[in-house]
């Protein structure tokens, strides 16, 4: 069987609240780490979320 094209990665809040999103990423096309501005409900603001390894 072939390897799947996408992997799951965790986007963790930079506000140190512990809040995170799990998203799919194609490592062949996107070699850099992902960073998005998303909503963190624990601080009730949009903050940067950075990619970390999903354990």
UniProtKB/Swiss-Prot annotation:
Entry-linked SUPFAM superfamilies: Zn-binding ribosomal proteins
InterPro entries (alphabetical): Ribosomal_bL33, Ribosomal_bL33_CS, Ribosomal_bL33_sf, Ribosomal_zn-bd
GO MF entry, a single one: structural constituent of ribosome
Coiled coil: none
Keywords: Ribonucleoprotein, Ribosomal protein
GO CC, one annotated term: large ribosomal subunit
Gene3D superfamilies attached to this UniProt entry: Ribosomal protein L33 (2.20.28.120)
GO biological process, any: translation
Family label: Belongs to the bacterial ribosomal protein bL33 family.
Name this polypeptide is given: Large ribosomal subunit protein bL33
Source organism: Rhodospirillum rubrum (strain ATCC 11170 / ATH 1.1.1 / DSM 467 / LMG 4362 / NCIMB 8255 / S1)
